[in-house]
Amino acid sequence: MEGCETRGQLYYHPAYLFAIIFQGTSGYLTFPILFIILKKYAFKVYYHPNLVFLMMLNVVSCLLLGGLTAWSATNFFLNLMIKPSPCDLLLKTYFCSKIRGTFLFAFCLVTTSHAGILLERSWATYSVKNYERQGRALGTILAIVAVAVAATAIFILLLPEDGEEMITTCLTFSASKSIGSRVYVMFFVQLLLDAVISIVHLVLYRYNKNIDKHGSTSLSEQFQRNENVKTLKQVTPLLILSNVTIGVYIFIVSVFRLYKDYLPPNWYEIIAANLFIMPHMPFMFTSLILVELWLGKKRQDRIHKDMMASQDVPLDDQFHIAMENWDVHFQSRLKAQARANRKPLSANWTSSTLITKFKKRQTTVAVISIPPSPS
């Protein structure tokens, strides 16, 4: 009972309250940002259907992560208001089992969907000549595989979970005695996978950006490569953010975990809650996507404005320029035709001249060879 009361005191610690409020705020802010993205940009981005399927997985992941984070924080403060004693504030793990599994599944789905986007863009780069005419089978298969891999990984991770273990919130992972170490392993595997994906993304981005600077390929290939560049440019910051946040979290919390037994009661949980960056990642992901889309729109408007400014010529001048161009092209074409016809005309003229001279010579010889008539 004494240990229960000691753990229940976490609910009243200012540093722990700050961590929960911060997490809940991030969760709630995810939804208006997603609404802005879907309203302003979702129907103005014309990507291949395969890519759209995989990017929608990221949207679903952000919705799940943001929603569960907001729910966990709300449930925390509701319990704080209605539960009378510290022991009543604690939750049994079986109450949160599905919520924890869904949160970890959504977080793992972020990485597997990024891997799917990498494979899809790699195939789009390889078959750039005919990828636009290919169907939606690749995107559907990659999306199913991404969901299946994430679900299988979380199912294996939660197998040793103790349903009777007492926890403060449903998103308490690192302090869990039954699955805490396994969650760290999953985060570390995600960190390695995201690092590999980031490197390959960078290679694909530079290849697609530099392969056709002179526009020597077909218009369809140029469009597909441009789509590759835009997509990889948008996804790469998300991968970098994921690598940095997970890496920093694993490193710092692992160090504190070594000295867990030497810290005052509840202080490891307080430190872990304030450093637990995963509940903030949907807010950071959506914010990065919104900023990238806004910068892309601003860049596109500037390019369009510069193009219009370079063509800002009065109407009469445009007419004269067009007429001059027509005259120039007509004269050059006429001269080319004349040069092409000059050689055959010269040959015909030479042969006809020789025939005429030959006939005249025959006539002259014939006249000279006529004998005189007798008188």
Curated annotation (Swiss-Prot):
Bilayer disposition of the protein: Multi-pass membrane protein
Provenance organism: Caenorhabditis elegans
Transmembrane segments: 17-37, 51-71, 99-119, 138-158, 183-203, 236-256, 275-295
Cell compartments where the protein resides: Membrane
Entry protein name: Serpentine receptor class alpha-39
One of the GO biological process terms: detection of chemical stimulus involved in sensory perception
GO molecular function: olfactory receptor activity
Annotated InterPro entries: 7TM_GPCR_serpentine_rcpt_Srab, Nematode_rcpt-like_serp_alpha
Family: Belongs to the nematode receptor-like protein sra family.
Record keywords: Membrane, Transmembrane, Transmembrane helix
Major location category of this protein: membrane
Record's GO cellular component terms: membrane
